[in-house]
Regions:
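N-terminal amphipathic, basic helical "cap/leader" segment at the start of enzyme domains
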Residues: 1-107
Length: 107
């Protein structure tokens, strides 16, 4: 599934985000939007240049040996069914690799 295009210019500066960062142990029950999920995937491993060699996270020798997976629970992300997803940075898309709410199995 192709993800929505990421935002390059956020609503808050990096400095403000760092200054206002707090640990929260009480979470909202509101599901993430597909746009929010897309932004998280891109920030973790997204392509940051047109040639496709550079990503949002550094990697020695540009090897990028780590893949990004997300386990999505029932009604946790609008537009995604529950299951495990693999993120493909080259196409900025996710693919379902296992169906069902797997949170208890991976927690």
């Amino acid at each position: 599934m192709k993800l929505p295009k990421q935002k390059i210019h956020g609503e808050v500066s990096l400095e403000t985000a760092i200054k206002q960062r707090r640990t929260i142990r009480s979470f909202t029950s509101e599901p993430l939007s597909l746009e929010q999920c897309s932004q998280l995937f891109w920030a973790a491993q997204g392509i940051t240049e047109d040639r496709g060699f550079k990503r949002a996270a550094p990697s020695g020798g540009a090897l990028y040996p780590m893949d990004i997976y997300a386990v999505v629970g029932e009604n946790c992300v609008k537009g995604l069914e529950s299951g495990a997803y693999h993120y493909d940075p080259k196409s900025h898309a996710v693919s379902l690799v296992s169906k069902g709410d797997l949170r208890n199995k991976v927690a």
